[in-house]
């Protein structure tokens, strides 16, 4: 066989080995590339509020009414109200709950093969996502009232009462906290995808405990017996957040994105006059 013939056959055989790749869409991803924590990151990122929602809820509404914004003359400070802002908040908040829920679903129904590390880490990640989902749901029910407990299943869900949602959230936190393994550590890539605690299991556990205490206290007038029992049960699970370094906080950055804080953007200095808001 000539050298040219051997080279040609080698090229054909190589091409045949790669032929199946033509059926793989380069714009899609397979289960082995889907990391559940990407969805949790999407929820955390969105909850920081992009300039559209952040400006309307914080600056035009809260900051103007609280006289924390020097640009007076709009929003509730002059007695006007725009339902568009609250409609947007409803939609945004639903998306944050959806993304946290997706993280949980991807762990409960794996899309690919897990590594030995992922088999240890993902059960913890599920509990962290459950805690964050409760945080998002608490914001939703406190702002809009009844909320669905069986949402994001592809059908229109039924909305449950505030009482039922609160009872569910408290039970969810208790179970999630009890199932966190503080001995499991994330790898470097996983750490980078959690801007709150870098997937530190102990910090997430304390966060869940403190959130349970907070929600219990919100029931202190409406349901004092439940508030007392849940708060005491939360204390029995651990210390909760007691130090500054355990605080749930996300770093803000300048610019026009979810990461730019609504009260600290360089292009919106919100300067205040020394005399504009004096009361005679």
Model-derived regions, located:
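Conserved, well-structured interaction surfaces
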Residues: 69-188
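Bacterial N-terminal signal peptides that target proteins for export
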Residues: 1-3
């Amino acid at each position: 066989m000539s050298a040219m013939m051997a080279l040609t056959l080698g090229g054909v055989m190589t091409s045949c080995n790669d032929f199946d790749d033509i059926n793989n869409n380069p714009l899609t991803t397979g289960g082995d590339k889907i990391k559940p924590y990407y969805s949790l990151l999407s929820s955390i990122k969105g909850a920081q509020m992009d300039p559209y929602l952040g400006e309307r809820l914080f600056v035009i509404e809260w900051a103007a009414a609280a006289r924390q914004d020097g640009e007076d003359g709009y929003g509730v400070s002059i007695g006007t109200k725009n339902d568009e802002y609250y409609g947007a908040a409803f939609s945004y908040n639903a998306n944050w709950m959806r993304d946290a829920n997706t993280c949980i679903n991807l762990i409960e129904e794996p899309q690919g093969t897990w590594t030995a590390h992922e088999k240890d880490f993902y059960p913890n990640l599920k509990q962290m996502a459950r805690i964050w989902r409760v945080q998002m749901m608490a914001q939703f029910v406190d702002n809009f009232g009844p909320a669905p407990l069986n949402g994001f299943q592809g059908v229109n869900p039924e909305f449950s009462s505030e009482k039922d949602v609160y009872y569910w959230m408290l039970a969810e936190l208790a179970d999630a906290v009890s199932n966190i393994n503080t001995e499991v550590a994330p790898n470097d890539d996983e750490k980078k995808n959690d801007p709150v605690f870098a997937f530190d299991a102990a910090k997430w556990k304390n966060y869940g405990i403190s959130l349970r205490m907070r929600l219990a206290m919100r029931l202190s007038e409406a349901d004092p017996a439940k508030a007392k029992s849940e708060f005491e049960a939360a204390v029995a699970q651990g210390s909760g957040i007691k130090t500054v370094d355990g605080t749930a906080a996300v770093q803000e950055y300048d610019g026009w994105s979810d990461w730019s804080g609504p009260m600290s953007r360089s292009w919106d200095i919100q300067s205040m006059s020394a005399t504009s808001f004096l009361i005679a």
